Amino acid sequence: MRVLVTGGAGFIGSHFAKRLAAAGEEVVVLDKLTYSGNPANLAGAQVEFVEADICDQAAVAAAAAGCAAVVNFAAETHVDRSIHGASEFIETDVLGTYVLLDWVRENGTRLVQVSTDEVYGDVPEGSSSCEDDPLRPSSPYSASKAGGDLQVIAAVRTYGVDACITRGSNTYGPNQYPEKIIPLFVTNALDGEPLPLYGDGRQTRDWLHVEDHCAAVELVLREGASGEIYNVGGGEEVENRDLTRTILELTGTDESLVRHVEDRPGHDRRYSLDASKLRGVGWEPARALADGLPETVAWYRDNRDWWEPIKSGDYRAYYEKQYSERLG
C-alpha cells in the first residue's frame, strides 16, 4: 500500500512513517519543514520525501498520486505559540485539512486525521472524554484542530468521504522538539537551566508513548470504520509537578532548578481520555510511563547532537520571548 504521511518529518509523524516503511509499505512523506520539522528524524528510513506545504493543492496532488491513503500529522501544535499568533495554526490545521479532504474526496482515498485530546477542553475530576462529547477548545491551537476535525466529520456526512479521526493524549518519546514539557525540562535539567513550571504545577495530563500512539494510528488506518472517531489515551494521568520531580530524579538534578512561573492564559487543568472504543478494536498501550520516561531521558542524554543545535538560533529567541519575563 502506498501511503502519504503529511507532517512526516515532525515528532509523531516521523515515527509513524518509519513504522509503516518497516512494515513494508510504500511511504511518501510530505512536510513543509517548519521550525519543528527535521529531516534527520527520518534518517535511515526507506521513504520518499517531498518538501511542500499541505495548503499547496498542486503539491499535495503530485505527492498523493497513486496513494491508497493519507495520514495527516501536519499541524502547528504548540499552545504557547498559538497564543502569540494563530494565523499559521489556522492555515495549516484548518485550510490544510480542507486541501487534503478535497483531494481524497476527488480520488476516493482514505484519510486518517490525527487530532488531539485538547479539542475537548478541560475535563472535570472523575470523568473522561468520550468521542461523542462536545468540543470545547480552550486555546487557538485546540480551536484550529477542532476546526479540522469538524471539516472531516462534515465531509464524511456530506460527500461520503472515507475518513477517520484519532484524538491522542499527550505524547512523549525520542525526537520531540524541545518546546514541549518533557523534552524542555529534560534538556534544561541536563544543562543545569531552570525548569519553568506553570502556575502551581497541578495540571494533569494523560501520557502516551509515541510508539503506542503510532500503533493506534496504524490500526485505525487499516481497520478503523469510516466516519468514526477514536480516542488514543495512555491511561496514565500525572500532575505536571510530579512529572517534573521524576525528571529531576532521572537526570540527577534537584528541585532548586524548578521555577514556578506565571501560568499560561486559559490553561486547561486536566485532560483524560476514555479509549475503550479503540481498545475494542484491539489496541492497548504497550509501554508504561515508568519504563518509557527513563528511556526517553536516556535518549536525550545520549543524543545531544540532535537537540543542542535546535536550542540555539530561532529556538532561543522563542524561549526568551516566552520565559524571560516569567523567569525574571
Q: What feature does the model see in each segment?
A:
Residues M1-T171, E295, N303, P309-G328:
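N-terminal Rossmann-like NAD(P)+-binding domain of SDR-like oxidoreductases, especially those catalyzing
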Residues F16, A52, P183, A189-G328:
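C-terminal substrate-binding subdomain of Rossmann-fold SDR/epimerase-dehydratase oxidoreductases
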Residues I12, G37, A58, Q176, ...:
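Residues that form or flank phosphate/diphosphate-binding pockets in enzymes
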Residues N41, V123-P124, P174-Q176, K180, ...:
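Short beta-loop-alpha junction of Rossmann-like oxidoreductase domains
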Residues A59, A69, E88, L95, ...:
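Residue-level recognition of oxygen-bearing side chains
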Residues P137-S144, P174, P178-I182, D206-V210:
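The catalytic Tyr-centered alpha-helix of NAD(P)H-dependent dehydrogenases
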Residues G147, Q151, A155, F185, ...:
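Hydrophobic alpha-helix immediately C-terminal to the catalytic Tyr-X-X-X-Lys motif of short-chain
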